[in-house]
Amino acid sequence: MWKSVVGHDVSVSVETQGDDWDTDPDFVNDISEKEQRWGAKTIEGSGRTEHINIHQLRNKVSEEHDVLRKKEMESGPKASHGYGGRFGVERDRMDKSAVGHEYVAEVEKHSSQTDAAKGFGGKYGVERDRADKSAVGFDYKGEVEKHTSQKDYSRGFGGRYGVEKDKWDKAALGYDYKGETEKHESQRDYAKGFGGQYGIQKDRVDKSAVGFNEMEAPTTAYKKTTPIEAASSGTRGLKAKFESMAEEKRKREEEEKAQQVARRQQERKAVTKRSPEAPQPVIAMEEPAVPAPLPKKISSEAWPPVGTPPSSESEPVRTSREHPVPLLPIRQTLPEDNEEPPALPPRTLEGLQVEEEPVYEAEPEPEPEPEPEPENDYEDVEEMDRHEQEDEPEGDYEEVLEPEDSSFSSALAGSSGCPAGAGAGAVALGISAVAVYDYQGEGSDELSFDPDDVITDIEMVDEGWWRGRCHGHFGLFPANYVKLLE
């Protein structure tokens, strides 16, 4: 067809698109009111769009899909980069077991092509490095072991004549060996067993073995009940210090008592030797101290004298209890190591017995606790000895037992609510004091108070420990923890 148009001038007129309506003077707005209301026709710049054009949407989607596939092809793995990369450039990714067309395998030569002269050490045995280690040549000479008839047996087991000691069998024994056989049971010395002969070898005694002379005294499982105030208080350190000081004081007083008893016995023996005309009263006084039932009789006589004197024998005892009241300062000088105000003063024996004696006094049974019985025993012996020996010096028994009666009388006064008599010399009712420090009672007979608490009805039973009433309780408290009110 193109041949038919050759030589003709064909001109195609191209219609030029009109300008925008705002610049074209002959623009005609052919949009109806419905199209303007519902957006059926798109006008550029109006902000309203026409309905979706399916053809335009299909073309746009296909174009976007082509662009996406092109990106995937560029970014995704390429098949041309396998087995060494594209054109074999990426050698690090080449398959090691893959062989290309340029590979030339070395085929073993045929037997007709091999040089047999180079076997077993190379040609004419020159290649020694390739010779078979287990192969033996014609120049090999083997050393055959000698026959038994040809061996020199004089060199066995230590060499010839035993000279080669380094080759000696360690387990072999010669004729000079003398074994030590264990003795028979009839030949053994059994006196050396379990501690050696007669127990002399102490280093071989069994540590867990106990002899007949090791006897342990029976112990009691009694534990003193702890009050609620003492259990909840935080003064465990003060309690331990107080208990240790009380234990030391008790031991020291027991030693003093034992020394005084021994000294009095010696003096009593000396008096009996010097005055042979009156030995009977001394024997009568020594005999009651030995039997066991004596403490019961003494306790029955010691408790009633507070009210009325039963007999003439108890009168010297009661008068002697009333006279040693001035000895309290001597008793107070014993605790020297507690001058510091915050520290608790040592509790004396009379302080410990203050609360126990009134309890047994209030009960109908007159039997007291067994603790004061040995002290009453010593006191009775002491008083009877004082009647016999007027020139004998006063001992520590009066100092220990004198405050006991005074505290006993003061306890009776405190329990009855009336002032004490002249027997309790240091007791003064109606005294009040204010607490300076916090104190928690360690026992049921002690007070517990806080700072600035007022303590009334104070009884100065001792220099270190007083007795008073606080928060409805009546008991002991340390004197250096309070300040007297004027």
From Swiss-Prot:
Location(s), subcellular: Membrane; Cytoplasm; Mitochondrion
Acidic residues bias spans: 353-383, 390-405
Repeat region (Cortactin), residues: 79-115, 116-152, 153-189, 190-212
Gene Ontology CC entries for this record: cytoplasm; cytosol; endocytic vesicle; mitochondrion; nucleus; plasma membrane; transcription regulator complex
Record flagged with keyword Repeat: yes
PTM annotation: Phosphorylated by FES. Phosphorylated by LYN, FYN and FGR after cross-linking of surface IgM on B-cells. Phosphorylation by LYN, FYN and FGR requires prior phosphorylation by SYK or FES.
Topology in the lipid bilayer: Peripheral membrane protein
Gene Ontology MF term list: actin filament binding; protein kinase binding; RNA polymerase II-specific DNA-binding transcription factor binding; SH3 domain binding; signaling adaptor activity
Positions carrying Phosphotyrosine: 140, 198, 222, 378, 397
Name of the featured protein: Hematopoietic lineage cell-specific protein
